[in-house]
Design a protein with these regions (language model features):
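Bacterial N-terminal signal peptides
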Residues: 2-11
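OB-fold and OB-like single-stranded nucleic-acid-recognition modules
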Residues: 10-136
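Short, low-complexity, intrinsically disordered N-terminal peptides in bacterial proteins
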Residues: 1-2, 18
Length: 136
């Protein structure tokens, strides 16, 4: 019996796995992708939520949408976050977010999508960090 108790106590002392690493924000990379009209570029953006938009249905399900202002590169980017894969992020206008995902060019500044884990393992996972919590 005491061996079982020792095993249970030892098992409880095993540290929890570390959360997935968070990439360093690089708004200059977002700006460079915009200037090159690039698509399918993995980037990490950091800025304040500028505007909340209505959810939009797409072929892969409903998407939460909001615009992030990247102050150091004087541009905005649209974030499209798939709600059928990841939880809604309760962002508030003016609050800071870090967003990692795939950049797709458009004339308004581009958009970031794939801001969630990849359930089938065919794409790099993305995430949104807001108020100290990671949403992926």
């Amino acid at each position: 019996m005491s061996a079982l108790v020792a095993f249970v106590i030892a098992g409880a002392c095993v540290p929890a796995p570390s959360p997935a690493p968070v990439a360093v924000a690089d708004n200059a990379a977002v700006k460079a992708a915009f200037e090159r009209h690039a698509d399918s570029v993995e980037v990490t953006a950091s800025g304040a939520v500028d505007r909340l938009l209505s959810d939009q249905d797409g072929p892969s399900g409903p998407h939460e949408r909001f615009i992030v202002r990247l102050p150091d590169v004087a541009m905005t980017v649209l974030v499209e976050h798939n709600l059928s894969i990841a939880p809604r992020v309760p962002v508030v206008v003016g609050e800071h977010v870090d967003v990692h995902g795939e950049y797709v060019w458009n004339a308004q500044g581009g958009l970031l999508h794939f801001t969630h884990h990849d359930p089938d393992g065919s794409h790099e996972g993305g995430y949104i960090v807001y108020a100290g919590k990671r949403y992926d």
